[in-house]
Each structure stands twice: as C-alpha cells, then as structure tokens.
C-alpha cells in the first residue's frame, strides 16, 4: 500500500484555508496513485484551545472529507477538533475512498501540561480499521508517550498512525518515541506532524 504523509503548515483557526490545502494535497497524492493520505492533528484549525472558534460540526467536517475522498478516489486520515457542549473533542478520522467512515478516534490522552485536558474531553477506546489487507489504528500526539495503548493496538493492527502538532523543542522526543513504539510493538508507525509556527 502506498501511503503519503502530508506535513501541512496550518492556517490558525481558518477552516476554509486549511480544507483547501487538504484538498490540494489529496489531489496531488491521488495523481501519484497513493492509496492512503494522512494529515496531522487538528489540521483544520491548528492546535487551538479556543473551542469557540470551532464552528463546524463533526457531521459537516466528515461530510466534507468524504466528498474529497470520493472525488479523488483515495483513503484519507485526518485530525480535527469539534465543540461538544462546553468542551471540545480532539479527533482523528479515517475515511475510505468510497466515503465510509472506517475509524473515528477521540484522543485518549489530552496534553495535560498544556491544559488540553481542561478544554478537551478524553476518549475512552481504541479504533482499528482495515484498508486492503492492513489493519490500522490511529492515535494523536501526546498518546505517543503512553506505550500501553500502542501495545493493545498492536495485537491487531499492522499500522499505527500518530497525527501530531508536536513542537520543535521536543523533536528528539518525537523521533525517539516513534522509533520506540515501532520497535516495542513490531509494527509500522506513521508519524504525521504539522510544520510552521503555532
């Protein structure tokens, strides 16, 4: 399976600009016969703690991604945030080229040192989906520091993805932890980080 990792420079709290960039990357990947394109954490808003800026509903976002996937005949994995009641949810969804939602994961470990846990609700389960013969489990950023969930996922998954908004100051940790999770669990780990300034 040919996989592309889209390291986007995210436009801060600007859904329209970011979704246009997602579409551009997706079209390019499709033209190169990529079967799965993966985007970073919160790639439609940037890593924001301002949940009032999250105006699109989960249904609206998923419908938009479905259309991009179907129109380009490509599977898409993408991180986004939504407002749910008084808190947010940090999500990673995988949508098939036929428009089916294969996985819709909510981050289990919000980044406590940045106060994410006070603003975003945590998830309570691991999602595993299948594309072709590969089983895939998506995780998000700070989840990478918790090896137990990777061990659980690796009992079934061939591939684990980690969409992130990981800062340059801790780049060594990012690379070391991705390698460690792959070595520990003997599976493929795809890390997709954003670029640019937060």
Describe the function of each predicted region.
Residues 1-9:
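Short beta-strand segments enriched in small/hydrophobic residues
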Residues 3, 18, 26-52, 69, ...:
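Active-site beta-strand/loop signature of hydrolases that rely on acidic residues for catalysis
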Residues 13, 47, 170:
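Glycine/Thr-rich phosphate-binding loops of Rossmann-like dinucleotide-binding domains
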Residues 13, 17, 21, 53-60, ...:
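Alpha-helix N-cap and loop-to-helix initiation/capping positions
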Residues 17-28, 144-151:
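Short, acidic/polar
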Residues 59-77, 145-198:
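CN hydrolase (nitrilase-like) catalytic-core segments centered on the catalytic cysteine
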Residues 78-83:
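Short beta-strand-to-loop element that shapes/binds the nucleotide-sugar donor at the catalytic cleft/hinge
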Residues 84-155, 169-176:
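Active-site catalytic loop in hydrolytic enzyme cores
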